[in-house]
């Protein structure tokens, strides 16, 4: 119910000129959809989203599995390390976005005059050739703990004798 009603309401709104503020809604038919598919930025956005999803899925699975293998050992601090890796997953997406926007933007530019390191003078979020990797890195940082936990649960179900 909490999913179905808003879904159909949103689909209904997509056939009107409703802007969310003015209560007046006038039926526009498929005009909104025609406008979207004629917009040059729509295809760039879809391509960016597709690339980031593919990179994210591949890297999150590979790195999550490698972390699970590394933390499936009998080292003393494994539980603390597992918690540290999983912790970013519980953060809200908006919070993560603001934190990394500050770190990759303002914080980096403030560090450059102090250190002189060129890595701090790069526009991680403003350079069109780097923004994809910056976004994937941030999302990877946030979600890799989830993938690690899933793989770790699977690894712990395996019998230990063949693994040794």
Protein language model regions, located:
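A structural signal for multi-pass alpha-helical bundles of membrane permease subunits
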Residues: 1-164
């Amino acid at each position: 119910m909490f999913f179905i009603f808003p879904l159909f309401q949103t689909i209904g709104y997509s056939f009107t000129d409703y802007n969310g503020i003015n209560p007046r809604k006038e039926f526009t038919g498929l005009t909104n959809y025609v406008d979207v598919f004629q917009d040059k930025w729509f295809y760039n956005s879809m391509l960016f989203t597709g690339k980031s999803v593919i990179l994210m899925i591949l890297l999150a699975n590979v790195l999550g599995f490698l972390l699970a293998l590394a933390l499936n050992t009998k080292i003393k601090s494994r539980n603390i390390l597992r918690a540290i890796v999983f912790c970013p997953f519980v953060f809200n997406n908006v919070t993560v976005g603001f934190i990394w926007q500050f770190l990759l933007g303002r914080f980096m530019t403030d560090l450059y005059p102090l250190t002189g390191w060129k890595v701090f003078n790069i526009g991680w979020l403003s350079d069109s050739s780097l923004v994809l990797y910056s976004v994937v890195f941030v999302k990877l940082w946030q979600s890799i703990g989830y993938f690690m936990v899933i793989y770790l649960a699977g690894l712990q179900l395996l019998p230990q004798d063949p693994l040794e």
